[in-house]
Amino acid sequence: MQHGKHAITIDGVRQVFHVFGTGPLCLAHPGGPGFGWEYLRMPALEQHLTMVYLEPIGTGDSGRLPARRDYRLDVWARFLHGVAEHLGAPKVLVLGHSHGGFVAQRYALEHPDTLAGLILYATAPVLDADFWAAAMSNLELFPQQHPDQPEAAGMFGAYQATLAAPDDDAITHGLRRIMPVYFADYWAHEGRLAPVRAALRAWVDPLHGEEPAPFDVRRQLSSIATPALVLTGEHDFLCGPRWAAELHDAIPGSQLTILERSGHMAHLEEPEAFSRAVAGFSAKLPAR
């Protein structure tokens, strides 16, 4: 498959995706909702897999839906399926990060016959009041965890403001401001991570989708028969080991990997360890 940018039309809407790497196909759905796809690039993993990074509708050069309320998990899953069908592979490996993991779970439940494997990366099986209470409680501890970093003190308020951003420029600015909260220790690797931070982009409309009910698939996950890898960072304030354990316990035969020196962005914090975990899992899957 030719590397670089591709575009197709699904249900009358432009869907962009980007191809890099070599080996079996892996479709990767970024988080957010509304984050630009670029942060999810995984060069180390591209040595083992042909990575197909989706640029979700509502972001970047992909199309927009007529009404922002229509940005829902089932819609993103439908577009993910459209890309999989376009690629023509009988079965594909799907990786979902954070909110993209919600999309991947929905996809796995709706299209089990098209999956070769499922990688649930820094995500959770539920998005409810308890999830957010736990995340905000963890976030309040961030300044104490980084007492020598003045920037850490304002992160809780900055995070809340980012969630309430009124437009694309504001949410992009907010995301760049709060990026350190997604890492175990951003400042220890600032020289390497600062360019990623400066390049972050986000779009506000996908935040305003209206789900018919809060996301909660805990009772459905036992039906997933596809090989699954659940992976997160030990210091992920948002989708850490608690939620990874719930996913692992709920999905029969799943594998669990906790990266001890990572937060929410293990592919950037421990790229080699992350790549080994995913490539090792992929190598055990049936030929596809």
Residue ranges and their predicted role:
Residues 11-65, 69:
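Conserved HGGG/HGGXW glycine-rich cap/lid loop of the alpha/beta-hydrolase fold
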Residues 224, 230-232:
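Short beta-strand/loop motif that positions the catalytic acidic residue
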